[in-house]
From Swiss-Prot:
Domain of life: Eukaryota
Residues given in the record as ATP binding sites: A69, Q70, S71, G72, T73, G74, K75, T76
Function: ATP-dependent RNA helicase which is a subunit of the eIF4F complex involved in cap recognition and is required for mRNA binding to ribosome. In the current model of translation initiation, eIF4A unwinds RNA secondary structures in the 5'-UTR of mRNAs which is necessary to allow efficient binding of the small ribosomal subunit, and subsequent scanning for the initiator codon.
Domain topic, free-text comment: The Q motif is unique to and characteristic of the DEAD box family of RNA helicases and controls ATP binding and hydrolysis.
Ranges spanned by the short sequence motif DEAD box, renumbered to the chain: 174-177
Protein name per UniProt: ATP-dependent RNA helicase eIF4A
């Protein structure tokens, strides 16, 4: 087993033991169809997360796969990308069936499949309770290649022979522990009986209670087992402030002023788009600041050089998109500036949870316009934390 996954050594009882640790660390190396790869990048993915690096390839190769992973690890895209790689777009029939415990999750998955499959002529239908049965029947008769649904409605549609299973290649159970604990066991077992023997089974679950293990032993053949631990990031020890900026256009001056007051050992400045990163970099260079920039459109070797310079301290300020927010430890970062608040709140901890890692203290400063106030409140609530107005003596804190 590769030694880079230290988390695999101590495994509590309800965790599976990983039997697979091959890693594919870029989407380019996965041999995806060109139009699917285009969709992956257009969706905003830069590089695969830990689960995507491990699980996409065995799924594409046709193995049954059990992945133990929490939400927030990138699991939805893992099976969405795999399913889209495997379906025959010329065949109007359900080839991949994805089950989820709730309607909301099923709809969310459908959105991801549709978005990533944007450049492919692929149909994805959400087959969920609480919607019009007749419309469901009509949509299923069109033969969408991917169907996402909740167990009750999917079971009903299979029994009515509306959702035909004869062309099924892949069956995905997302949040299997949730589905089984909600009493869907019988329906799920039933659905298995309708599928062709050759159907590949992919099961994702945060925990591995007995009822989930039963499904894996009854219905899966020699599965690849992948355990992905979610890195525990914390906001402890990180002072979080905001600066109220009246207009978006004034953020640049605010940043310049901040530079004047603060001696920065090293800082990361986050923007939400690649374009903004380039724009801000140019503006700061024009004002004689030394900065480097990093985003997903750069070649990997270019990124590596920039990271090396930043790690060694020869470059002091790095402007980046969320690409940097996951999986890169820069120990000496004392300051993180959110020039833009993250578009989704999960990324907040990935951006600033790093500044204070290894017990180091850190400071995070958020630039907040009137439009951002709601998002900031949501972030505070989500993490049960306080983001306070930046005090005058901020220089003493960094």
């Amino acid at each position: 087993m590769a030694s880079n996954d230290k988390g695999l050594e101590e495994i509590p009882d309800n965790q599976i033991e990983s039997n697979y640790d091959e890693i594919t660390d870029s989407f380019d190396a996965m041999n995806l169809r060109a139009e699917l790869l285009r969709g992956v990048y257009a969706y905003g993915f830069e590089r695969p997360s830990a689960i995507q690096q491990r699980a996409i390839m065995p799924v594409i190769k046709g193995s049954d796969v059990i992945a133990q992973a929490q939400s927030g690890t990138g699991k939805t895209a893992t099976f969405s990308i795999s399913a889209l790689q495997k379906v025959d777009t010329n065949l109007k029939a359900c080839q991949a069936l994805i089950l989820a415990p709730t309607r909301e999750l099923a709809q969310q998955i459908q959105k991801v499949v549709v978005a990533i499959g944007d450049f492919m002529s692929v149909e994805c239908h959400a087959c969920i309770g609480g919607t019009n049965v007749r419309e469901d029947i009509k949509a299923l008769n069109d033969g969408p290649q991917v169907v996402v649904g909740t167990p009750g409605r999917v079971h009903d549609m299979i029994q009515r022979r509306v959702l035909k299973t004869d062309q099924m290649k892949m069956f995905v159970l997302d949040e299997a522990d949730e589905m089984l604990s909600r009493g869907f066991t019988e329906q799920i077992y039933d659905i298995f009986q309708f599928l062709p023997q050759s159907t590949q089974v992919v099961l994702l679950s945060a925990t591995m209670p007995q009822d989930v293990l039963d499904v894996t032993t009854k219905f899966m053949r020699d599965p690849v087992r992948i355990l992905v631990k979610k890195a525990e990031l914390t906001l402890e020890g990180i002072k979080q402030f905001y600066i109220a900026v009246e207009k978006e256009e004034w953020k640049l001056d605010t940043l310049s002023d901040l530079y004047e007051t603060v001696t920065i050992t090293q800082a990361v400045i986050f923007c939400n788009t690649r374009r903004k990163v380039d724009w801000l970099t140019d503006k700061l260079i024009a004002r004689d600041f030394t900065v480097s920039a990093m985003h997903g459109e750069m070649e990997q070797n270019q990124r590596d050089v920039i990271m090396k310079e930043f790690r060694s301290g020869s470059s002091r300020v790095l402007i980046a998109t969320d690409l940097l927010a996951r999986g890169i430890d820069v120990q000496q970062v004392s300051l993180v500036i959110n020039y833009d608040l993250p578009a989704n709140r999960e990324n907040y901890i990935h951006r600033i949870g790093r500044g204070g890692r290894f017990g180091r203290k850190g400071v995070a400063i958020n630039f907040v316009t009137a439009d951002d106030v709601r998002m900031m409140r949501e972030i505070e609530q989500f993490y049960s934390t306080q983001i306070e107005e930046m005090p005058m003596n901020v220089a003493d804190l960094i």
